[in-house]
Amino acid sequence: TVTALNVTDTAIILLNGQYGVEVGTQNHFRYTEKLNKPVIFLVNQLDNEKCDYDNILEQLKEAYGSKVVPIQYPIATGPGFNALIDVLLMKKYSWKPEGGAPTIEDIPAEEMDKAMEMHKALVEAAAENDEGLMEKFFEQDSLTEDEMREGIRKGLIARGMFPVFCVCGGKDMGVRRLMEFLGNVVPFVSEMPKVENTDGKEVAPDVNGPESLYFFKTSVEPHIGEVSYFKVMSGKVREGDDLLN
């Protein structure tokens, strides 16, 4: 886990919908603290009969405080799970029993009060991470969708916000929306604090900079021999390049 986090830009901590916060959850979170990585919590197995999403949210808030902010909530959990409310986009996502591409609709009237309450909490949490957004929030009591995304991005960078998503991974329900969020909202590597090399010098993530690689794993594969895995921290690496450590 620690090895993977060293080459990860944003960590997604997966929670089993049956059990919520476990020892592994706490250990993984501590690793992200040490490495100063942004964190997203992801609750899976919403179709399990023992899943209690509201209780899991309470567990997360008890463990990690008010920085835990849900982006989504399921309308119902258990074997009949097939819909959730996204309080960033303020839309209902629903699926056919086999999952796949969602149907996106307006939020039904019976869910609007809960959705608005969670939306306002998300707006406030997003505003807290940017002085300009906070001023606008105080003046208008709202933010645009793009402003919310920017506030969430800054909150992730500063570890001032831990968004919560929910999925039923086995049926491909919610996964595509999560991937969309990762593409549109999570911080770019260029926005994150600079890393240092073994000489204590900062390494800027510049494609035109000097070649700098971080080797994070070496394994021995049958019929191949040693295989090393690395992340390019700066510069470019091409097949056949000779690199000096």
Model-predicted segments: where are they?
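Structural and coupling elements of P-loop NTPases
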Residues: 1-245
